[in-house]
């Protein structure tokens, strides 16, 4: 066991990393969100639909090429904690983690292959 592993294990005991969705302690291999919550995340799949509900929302109001969202936000839903942690609890690393997850799906779908910029809202 390396010093880094011992140090991280000690940190996990003293300051356990908690899943923002279900408040369970994260396993050593989990990053930011536990495996169960990642599996159950209410993904929109808007990136698989041309002129999806989000694009319809912006149509005629804002000049956009495409619009999408990673997961459904519903007030009171435990997944709303992800957004709250980003906005109010200074958790930029959680944002990078979620953005990377969704970016992999977007790249695989080709949905944004002709887009120069993505603006997170």
Name each model feature, range by range.
Residues 1-121:
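Glycine-rich phosphate/pyrophosphate-handling loop used in enzymes and phosphotransfer proteins
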């Amino acid at each position: 066991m390396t010093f880094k592993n011992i140090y991280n294990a000690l940190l996990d005991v003293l300051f356990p990393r908690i899943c923002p969705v279900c408040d369970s302690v994260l396993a050593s291999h989990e990053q930011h969100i536990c495996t169960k919550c990642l599996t159950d995340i209410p993904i929109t799949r808007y990136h698989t639909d041309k002129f999806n509900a989000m694009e319809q929302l912006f149509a005629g109001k804002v000049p956009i090429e495409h619009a999408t969202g990673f997961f459904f936000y519903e007030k009171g839903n435990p997944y709303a904690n992800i957004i709250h942690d980003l906005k109010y609890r200074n958790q930029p690393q959680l944002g990078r983690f979620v953005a990377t997850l969704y970016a992999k799906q977007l790249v695989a779908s080709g949905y944004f292959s002709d887009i120069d910029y993505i603006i997170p809202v």
